[in-house]
Protein backbone atom coordinates (compact mmCIF):
# COMPACT_ATOMS: atom_id res chain seq x y z
CA UNK A 1 0.00 0.00 0.00
CA UNK A 2 1.25 3.45 -0.87
CA UNK A 3 0.24 6.80 0.48
CA UNK A 4 1.50 9.64 -1.69
CA UNK A 5 1.37 13.15 -0.25
CA UNK A 6 2.28 16.53 -1.77
CA UNK A 7 1.58 15.43 -5.35
CA UNK A 8 0.72 17.75 -8.23
CA UNK A 9 -3.05 18.36 -8.17
CA UNK A 10 -3.26 18.55 -11.97
CA UNK A 11 -1.78 15.07 -12.36
CA UNK A 12 -4.02 13.66 -9.62
CA UNK A 13 -7.02 14.92 -11.58
CA UNK A 14 -5.90 13.58 -14.99
CA UNK A 15 -7.71 10.27 -15.46
CA UNK A 16 -5.94 9.35 -18.71
CA UNK A 17 -2.47 9.98 -17.30
CA UNK A 18 -3.29 8.05 -14.12
CA UNK A 19 -4.57 5.13 -16.21
CA UNK A 20 -1.33 5.16 -18.22
CA UNK A 21 0.81 5.21 -15.06
CA UNK A 22 -1.09 2.39 -13.36
CA UNK A 23 -1.12 0.14 -16.44
CA UNK A 24 2.58 0.77 -17.03
CA UNK A 25 3.27 -0.04 -13.37
CA UNK A 26 1.56 -3.41 -13.85
CA UNK A 27 3.77 -4.03 -16.88
CA UNK A 28 6.88 -3.05 -14.91
CA UNK A 29 5.90 -5.71 -12.36
CA UNK A 30 5.71 -8.24 -15.22
CA UNK A 31 2.02 -8.76 -14.48
CA UNK A 32 -0.60 -9.81 -17.03
CA UNK A 33 -3.33 -7.15 -17.33
CA UNK A 34 -6.83 -8.62 -17.61
CA UNK A 35 -8.82 -5.38 -17.68
CA UNK A 36 -8.92 -1.89 -16.22
CA UNK A 37 -11.53 0.66 -15.26
CA UNK A 38 -11.12 4.28 -14.18
CA UNK A 39 -13.67 6.86 -13.11
CA UNK A 40 -13.41 10.66 -12.90
CA UNK A 41 -15.36 12.35 -10.13
CA UNK A 42 -16.75 15.87 -10.42
CA UNK A 43 -15.45 18.32 -9.45
CA UNK A 44 -12.19 16.38 -8.98
CA UNK A 45 -10.65 13.04 -8.17
CA UNK A 46 -10.02 9.74 -9.89
CA UNK A 47 -10.50 6.14 -8.79
CA UNK A 48 -9.33 3.20 -10.80
CA UNK A 49 -8.44 -0.44 -10.85
CA UNK A 50 -6.12 -2.49 -13.02
CA UNK A 51 -7.11 -6.13 -12.73
CA UNK A 52 -4.11 -8.36 -13.28
CA UNK A 53 -4.10 -12.11 -13.61
CA UNK A 54 -2.31 -12.19 -10.26
CA UNK A 55 -4.71 -9.75 -8.43
CA UNK A 56 -4.97 -5.92 -8.81
CA UNK A 57 -3.64 -2.38 -8.55
CA UNK A 58 -6.00 0.34 -7.31
CA UNK A 59 -5.80 4.11 -6.92
CA UNK A 60 -7.95 6.79 -5.34
CA UNK A 61 -6.91 10.45 -5.65
CA UNK A 62 -7.79 13.60 -3.76
CA UNK A 63 -6.27 16.40 -5.87
CA UNK A 64 -7.54 19.04 -3.47
CA UNK A 65 -5.27 17.49 -0.83
CA UNK A 66 -2.38 16.49 -3.13
CA UNK A 67 -2.95 12.90 -1.98
CA UNK A 68 -3.26 9.47 -3.59
CA UNK A 69 -3.92 6.09 -1.95
CA UNK A 70 -2.61 3.17 -3.99
CA UNK A 71 -2.74 -0.59 -3.45
CA UNK A 72 -0.50 -3.01 -5.32
CA UNK A 73 -1.81 -6.46 -4.43
CA UNK A 74 -0.67 -9.80 -5.79
CA UNK A 75 -0.86 -13.47 -4.97
CA UNK A 76 2.26 -14.20 -7.06
CA UNK A 77 5.51 -13.66 -5.16
CA UNK A 78 7.50 -13.82 -8.41
CA UNK A 79 6.22 -10.49 -9.71
CA UNK A 80 8.53 -7.48 -9.60
CA UNK A 81 6.39 -5.46 -7.20
CA UNK A 82 9.20 -3.16 -6.16
CA UNK A 83 9.66 -2.12 -9.80
CA UNK A 84 5.97 -1.17 -9.94
CA UNK A 85 6.18 0.74 -6.64
CA UNK A 86 9.29 2.64 -7.74
CA UNK A 87 7.70 3.54 -11.06
CA UNK A 88 4.51 4.79 -9.41
CA UNK A 89 6.34 6.92 -6.83
CA UNK A 90 8.59 8.42 -9.52
CA UNK A 91 5.70 9.24 -11.84
CA UNK A 92 3.64 10.96 -9.16
CA UNK A 93 6.71 12.79 -7.82
CA UNK A 94 5.26 12.84 -4.31
CA UNK A 95 6.87 15.02 -1.69
CA UNK A 96 6.15 12.39 0.95
CA UNK A 97 5.70 8.64 0.38
CA UNK A 98 4.58 6.11 2.96
CA UNK A 99 4.72 2.40 2.13
CA UNK A 100 2.88 -0.28 4.08
CA UNK A 101 3.54 -3.95 3.41
CA UNK A 102 0.90 -6.45 4.39
CA UNK A 103 1.47 -10.18 4.04
CA UNK A 104 -1.79 -12.01 3.42
CA UNK A 105 -2.55 -15.69 3.54
Swiss-Prot record:
Residue positions where Pyruvic acid (Ser) is found in the record: 55
Xref: PANTHER family: S-ADENOSYLMETHIONINE DECARBOXYLASE PROENZYME
Family: Belongs to the prokaryotic AdoMetDC family. Type 1 subfamily.
One GO molecular-function entry: adenosylmethionine decarboxylase activity
GO biological process assignments: spermidine biosynthetic process
Subunit structure: Heterotetramer of two alpha and two beta chains arranged as a dimer of alpha/beta heterodimers.
EC number annotated for this UniProt entry: 4.1.1.50
Binding note for cofactor: Binds 1 pyruvoyl group covalently per subunit.
Entry PTM: Is synthesized initially as an inactive proenzyme. Formation of the active enzyme involves a self-maturation process in which the active site pyruvoyl group is generated from an internal serine residue via an autocatalytic post-translational modification. Two non-identical subunits are generated from the proenzyme in this reaction, and the pyruvate is formed at the N-terminus of the alpha chain, which is derived from the carboxyl end of the proenzyme.
The protein's required cofactors: pyruvate
This protein's UniProt keywords: Autocatalytic cleavage, Decarboxylase, Lyase, Polyamine biosynthesis, Pyruvate, S-adenosyl-L-methionine, Schiff base, Spermidine biosynthesis, Zymogen
Function: Catalyzes the decarboxylation of S-adenosylmethionine to S-adenosylmethioninamine (dcAdoMet), the propylamine donor required for the synthesis of the polyamines spermine and spermidine from the diamine putrescine.
Swiss-Prot/TrEMBL catalytic activity: S-adenosyl-L-methionine + H(+) = S-adenosyl 3-(methylsulfanyl)propylamine + CO2
Disulfide-linked positions: none
Name of the protein in its database record: S-adenosylmethionine decarboxylase proenzyme 1
Catalytic center residues: 55, 60, 75
Site feature location: Cleavage (non-hydrolytic): 54-55
Associated pathway: Amine and polyamine biosynthesis; S-adenosylmethioninamine biosynthesis; S-adenosylmethioninamine from S-adenosyl-L-methionine: step 1/1
One annotated Gene Ontology cellular component of this protein: cytosol
Keyword Cell inner membrane (UniProt): no
Top-level taxon in the UniProt lineage: Bacteria
Amino acid sequence: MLELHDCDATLLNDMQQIKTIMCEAACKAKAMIVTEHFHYFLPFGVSGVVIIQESHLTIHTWPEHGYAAIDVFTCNSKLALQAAVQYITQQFNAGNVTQHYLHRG
